[in-house]
């Protein structure tokens, strides 16, 4: 009986800690719930054109599952490129992303990237402060094969949502694997992305 009472007492003591762990924001960034974020196109250092637009589409879709974060729509970014008289009106690289973020009054933007790391793929992200250009958070995760890239994007998306202050509880309840909410084919995602940019 004494052992059971100790166990119950320990559980009661730890419960508030667990609740704080589950629901706390855990962020020091200047981002509030329902603020806007801009995601640039992927910095593709692999030379594989398959990744040019497909990964942006998958990554933005993954983060857009969050009701905590507002992701600036692709259509709005392309409208800005038109107004900027950009030479390339379908590509949002880091400089273009920064200018669009300034125009839209967005405090932070995300620059994702992919490169080859031996036989693996390195998936990276930078959260950049628009006003200063400073990188305030950066992440790198690895996919063993091309087939693992979407699941790695899922992991990266969850980490970024956490970095922006979303609680673990909200992330767990608003997070479906990309392979369930869209196609698992990067080729199909690329074709879909090209249709959006036309």
Region locations from a protein language model:
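Acidic, proline/glycine-rich low-complexity intrinsically disordered segments
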Residues: 4-198
């Amino acid at each position: 009986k004494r052992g059971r009472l100790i166990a119950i007492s320990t559980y009661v003591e730890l419960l508030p800690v667990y609740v704080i762990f589950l629901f706390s924001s855990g962020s020091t960034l200047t981002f509030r719930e329902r603020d806007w974020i801009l995601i640039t196109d992927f910095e593709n250092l692999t030379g594989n054109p398959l990744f040019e637009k497909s990964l942006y589409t998958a990554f933005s879709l993954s983060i857009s599952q969050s009701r905590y974060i507002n992701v600036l729509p692709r259509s709005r970014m392309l409208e800005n490129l038109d107004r900027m008289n950009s030479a390339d009106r379908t590509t949002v690289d880091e400089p273009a992303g920064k200018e669009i973020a300034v125009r839209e009054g967005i405090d932070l933007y995300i620059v994702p990237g992919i490169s080859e790391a031996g036989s693996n793929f390195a998936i990276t992200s930078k959260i950049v402060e628009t006003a200063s250009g400073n990188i305030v958070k950066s992440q790198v995760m690895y996919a063993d094969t091309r087939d693992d890239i979407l699941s790695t994007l899922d992991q990266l998306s969850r980490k970024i949502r956490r970095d922006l202050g979303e609680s673990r509880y909200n992330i767990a309840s608003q997070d479906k694997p990309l392979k369930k909410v869209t196609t698992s084919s990067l080729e199909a995602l690329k074709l879909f992305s090209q249709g959006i940019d036309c």
